[in-house]
């Protein structure tokens, strides 16, 4: 983290998402982090300028405790993955309650179909489009089909109308994955 920060990386991630991820991505060559909640404190103590982004689990019965704990440990930004409904997105933002910035990780068909309601009715700080899980939900063979078939562009047009900062991703390490990132 310190090396990344030294070279002006502005966000350092801790990925706590575990619930349901192994099942969704079973048998695939995907990155599944083994971070623990204690890593939030360790990384927070090792950086001074970069923002600490923590991806938590999708909404579940212990979300309030998990989110409160990562805030106490120093998260600047919290990302909610794999949500499907406006209510889940609202619940997440309500739990965070302005104590950190919020990013919704749009990676389900349910969330994609409700994107208009989400951007109108949820007070998130950013939206990130997750290509990996979204392409799996659509039954596509390759995550970049979402770029080629116009799905990402369609979502982005809606997000841009509301001037919400956004990004998309799912690219593997430089020389890994079905399509090495250096070729993109």
Task: Describe each PLM feature range.
Residues 46-52, 69-78, 97-100, 161-165:
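Short, surface-exposed connector motifs at secondary-structure boundaries
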Residues 20-43, 60-65, 82-100, 111-114, ...:
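Active-site-adjacent beta->alpha loops and helix N-cap segments on the catalytic face
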Residues 5-21:
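N-terminal glycine-rich anion-binding loops that anchor highly charged ligand groups
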Residues 63-79, 177-184:
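Short, electropositive alpha-helical surface patch
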Residues 1, 12-14, 52-56, 78-80, ...:
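Hydrophobic faces of well-ordered beta-strands that scaffold small-molecule active sites
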Residues 101-184:
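Catalytic alpha/beta core domains of metabolic enzymes, predominantly
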